[in-house]
Amino acid sequence: MTGLRWAHQAARCVTALLLASCAGPPLTLYTLYTLGPALDAAPLGRRALVIEVSRVSLPNAFDTEDILVRHGSVLRRSAQGRWASRLSSGITGLLAARLAQRRPDALVTVQPQIEAPAYRVLVNISQLDVTAEGTAAVEADWQVVPGNLALSPQRYRGAFSATGAVATDQDVVTLEGAVLDQLAKRIGDVSLK
């Protein structure tokens, strides 16, 4: 009986060791932007200009938590890295943060407000690719809808690209962030002067 008990114990130990040896590296979560040090911004006041950035629209294949790299017609996801949230949410946050940097006089938010905002920014990304060759590309169109219904919405579109390393997940995140920063800059330059 003790021999059988010993065999079961040994089998459990071997199974545990095999499972532990099969475990991969720990999962790393990434965001598109980092928060800088808190600035001593002046209070906005009761009638501050409010700019609401609506959730960005992306093709379904890309609106995931997976970090994707295109190899020809194949999308490969990272085994070790993920976005901390769905990509559309991360891009929305990035755009709002960049617009807030450009417009310190305004409250730039991704949250709906009680009163209608002075401007609502709606962004549709039709293409967002990072290739194994190290090229990131974004094609987008966007509207700036004034809160004043007597004014017409402004419509824009643009294509942006950047090149860089894609050897690691951090490289992919940095490259994707660079091309999305170009989009944010263009939105701020032409839409919200």
Name the predicted role of every residue range.
Residues 96-104, 188-192:
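Sec-exported extracytoplasmic/periplasmic mature domains
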Residues 85-89:
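Conserved Nudix-box catalytic region and its N-terminal flanking loop in Nudix hydrolases
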Residues 22-84, 117, 192-193:
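A structural "domain/chain start" motif
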Residues 1-22:
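Sec-dependent bacterial lipoprotein signal peptides
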Residues 74-84, 149-189:
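Short secondary-structure boundary motifs at beta->alpha junctions and helix caps
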Residues 23-41, 102-149, 164-166:
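Surface-exposed short loop/turn segments
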Residues 50-56, 68, 120-124, 137-143, ...:
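Soluble periplasmic/extracytoplasmic beta-strand elements of cell-envelope proteins
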